[in-house]
Design a protein with these regions (language model features):
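Exposed acidic/Ser/Thr-rich ligand/metal-binding surfaces
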Residues: 2-192
Length: 192
């Protein structure tokens, strides 16, 4: 999110966190960056190999915060880049409410559900006090991820770097449970 409300310390911390992630990509990783405000802007037209990270870090450091917040368009563009043959993590960061394009939370959820690969994992970070927690929580829960929230006085860069260290080398993926006919009532997290 590079909308105008991100300007200042929040945006600087987001840039630092993204710099950390880019500098810690695994050799076989592929990535892209989609910034959004009134419109969207991509680092590249398609996913790039990890050895492009240095160039991407320079690109990120040149970004500026301005404009409104088009969450729907950013999510749909990101979903369109997914390679169904590989596990995909989407890290989504915003400080606000959708104010541009599609702004209805239910429509955004429906649009993304229709566009996202079933294997996409969405991790959401909400920054500040004026965040659509219903939308962000629903997006994360519906796409095998999690949501985290940061207050303006908290260190976003530290939270994101800790988070990335946790997901960059997954121990288990594609888990499934077979209860062999047993009746179950609760499963957490759901979906697994």
């Amino acid at each position: 999110d590079r909308s105008g409300s991100m300007d200042g310390e929040k945006f600087r911390q987001a840039q630092q966190a993204l710099d950390y992630i880019l500098s810690h990509l695994n050799p076989g990783d592929r990535f892209n960056i989609i910034t959004f405000s009134t419109g969207t802007e991509r680092y590249a037209n398609r996913l790039r190999p990890a050895d492009y990270a240095g160039n991407a870090r320079t690109w990120v450091n040149g970004l500026r915060a301005e404009g409104s917040t088009d969450i729907n368009r950013a999510l749909l563009e990101a979903a369109d880049m997914v390679d169904d043959d590989r596990p995909t993590y989407l890290i989504f960061l915003t400080d606000g409410l959708p104010t541009e394009g599609v702004t209805d939370s239910e429509r955004i959820l429906s649009n993304f559900a229709g566009a996202a690969s079933p294997d996409l994992r969405l991790f959401v970070f909400g920054v500040g006090y004026d965040v659509d927690t219903y939308l962000l929580d629903s997006l994360a829960q519906g796409h095998h991820g999690s949501s985290s929230y940061v207050l303006p006085e908290d260190r976003l860069d530290e939270l994101l770097s800790t988070f990335y260290a946790r997901i960059s080398t997954p121990v288990l993926t594609g888990l499934a449970l077979d209860f062999d006919g047993l009746v179950t009532y609760d499963l957490y997290p759901s979906p697994l």
